[in-house]
């Protein structure tokens, strides 16, 4: 399960009871800090995504000491006005104009972020013939490696 929370819920001493409540019931898998522009223009507070897995005797046995994945989004995805940023077609940089943006194989402009890699697959005959990576690996790919290393139940 994933929950988007204001950053203060992770840091404020007065919110310790919330953190304790969650930790008693779930394994904290990851905390991913989102860029402050993520929810603009509608809201501006810094937020993070908390990923948890409910304690379960079979799938997620309770342990007292375990590793947690931490990451921070560095590529904003939106500018200060809340307009989406796209990877520019040629060269490095960004644009707010989808017409000038790098696109995936379906013609969708690729948003400028580092949450996950944008990968196109050539599946002409129903099988993957070729994998074309449009953007670098991101936070999701790093989490997958972490989950495999930690032998989490959903990546065994």
Question: What is the meaning of each model-derived region?
Answer:
Residues 2-156:
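A conserved structural/catalytic subdomain of Rossmann-like adenosyl-cofactor enzymes
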